[in-house]
Swiss-Prot record:
Transmembrane segments: none annotated. Residues 223-432 form the Cytochrome c domain. Heme c binds at residues 236, 239-240. Pfam families: RoxA-like_Cyt-c (PF21419). The keyword Electron transport applies. Keywords: Electron transport, Heme, Iron, Metal-binding, Plasmid, Transport. One of its GO terms (molecular function) is electron transfer activity. This is Uncharacterized protein y4iM. It comes from the Bacteria.
């Protein structure tokens, strides 16, 4: 039995307060017709919002009970990961102990493992007027779980805009369709696949289709950017292009491979079962922004998730670089602080500051000097030191010139002879 810090009375009182907040909002507040009345958003009408409000208020006690339950379950999952993936001698803090980062599975592995271990009816009201509390967190943490990798898989949270340009999702390219990408994002939060909201999953898939990135908010030298565009087309665009489904492996780019290897056979089957269980209505359909009927719950196999479980098929996607100015730090594990350091590999620091909000417009990234940590830590509790010597933190890769499609492509812009070209390329990347 596990102690939960909640009671049916607290849950009911919280549900009533949230319902009052919902009722206080005018019609159209949650689903503005200007956005959700378009074909790509299921032709939502004000009546849809009325129904959604009623459904949420009805289910609030159960949702809050599950959330309260999940606090203890997540704690058990985190403790399990701390002694497995993050238990090595040079292991980083959980999720990198850093802002904007997470475990390589997005915490999905341990959440699905917890869901499997949950006794039926856990955290639901019982005849005695309390909540069922039978989950054994100690036994769960002490059990063997081959699904969890024995190494840290630190991951920067990727951008999600302009999904229509991306054939593959997740850093390892294991998920294709936007609908399933959203399932993957929801499951670590919801935990129980049967509670996934399919309608909202379709809405979000369409919302992200064509959603533009924020424009670079500082001045740009447009003459320099025009010159940089030509350099980008000659050296970068061959990989960083829409609908590129190539998986680039270690021998190609030399990047830390921990995140690419997050899926083993056991984890893949856990994911596949969780995804399929999430699509609990085989007849569910939604319309894409082009009006096409989509029935995701009738899909199976690699249309849902790809088994990237062996080194031969593991690697990383080369994403479209839209809004790249806002994605710092760079690479899948956030190991490169600025675009300048990405393009001048010899300059990459072994340690740098994460979590600062002061922006470096020359190098395109955030202020990174660890020496200033003590000066600002009291007012910026999110500041941490990123150490490339930690497991999964290597800042290697994208650091040597490559021949692609029979032509040499420059990735390393070190040296005074490339100083002007480097400035032009960085200036252009600000406009993406």
């Amino acid at each position: 039995m596990t102690a939960y810090f909640s009671t049916p009375e607290k849950i009911q009182a919280s549900a009533e307060r949230i319902a009052a907040i919902i009722d206080a909002k005018p019609n159209g507040y949650f689903y503005p017709p200007a956005y959700f009345g378009k074909p790509g958003f299921l032709n939502f009408t004000p009546n849809v919002e009325v129904a959604q409000r009623a459904a949420l208020k009805k289910n609030l006690p159960g949702i809050l009970a599950t959330f309260a339950c999940g606090t203890v379950q997540r704690e058990a999952g985190i403790e399990l990961q701390k002694q497995t993936s993050y238990g090595n001698w040079n292991g980083p803090g959980f999720s990198g102990f850093s802002t904007g980062q997470q475990d390589g599975s997005g915490d999905l592995i341990f959440q699905l493992l917890v869901a499997k271990a949950m006794p039926p009816g856990e955290c639901q009201p019982n005849a005695a007027g309390g909540l069922n509390r039978n989950f054994d967190a100690t036994a769960f943490k002490n059990s063997s779980h081959p699904e969890i990798p024995p190494f840290a898989t630190i991951t920067d949270i990727p951008s999600v805009w302009n999904q229509q340009e991306r054939s593959l999702a997740q850093w390892d390219g294991s998920v294709k369709m936007a609908f399933w990408r959203n399932i993957a994002a929801q499951l670590p939060i919801v935990g129980d696949p049967s509670k996934i909201d399919l309608v909202n999953t379709g809405v979000v898939a369409n919302f992200l289709d064509g959603l533009p990135p924020a424009a670079y908010p500082f001045d740009v030298d447009m003459a320099s950017a025009v010159r940089g565009e030509a350099l980008f087309k000659d050296n970068c665009a061959v990989c960083h292009k829409p609908h590129n489904d190539t998986i680039y492996q270690f021998r190609d780019i030399g990047t830390d491979m921990n995140r690419a290897a997050v899926l083993n056979d056991a984890a893949f089957h856990l994911f596949a079962a969780g995804f399929q269980a999430s699509c609990h209505d085989q007849d569910f359909l939604y319309r894409s922004p082009t009006g096409e009927e989509v029935r995701p719950c009738r899909m199976a196999g690699e249309d849902v998730i790809t088994a990237r479980t062996t080194p031969a098929v593991q690697g990383y996607v080369a994403e479209v670089l839209d809004g790249v100015w806002a994605r710092a730090p760079y690479l899948h594990n956030g190991s490169i602080p600025t675009l300048y350091h990405l393009l001048v590999p010899a300059s990459r620091p072994e340690q740098f500051l994460r979590g600062a909000i002061q922006y470096d417009t020359a190098k395109v990234g955030y202020v990174l000097d660890p020496a200033v940590t003590g000066l600002v830590a009291d007012t910026s509790p999110t500041l941490t030191i990123y150490d490339r010597r930690k497991d999964g933190h290597a800042g290697t890769g994208h650091d040597r010139n490559l021949v692609v499609d029979g032509k040499l492509r420059r990735l390393d812009w070190s040296g005074p002879q490339y100083a002007d070209a480097l400035k032009d390329l960085i200036e252009y990347l600000k406009t993406r």
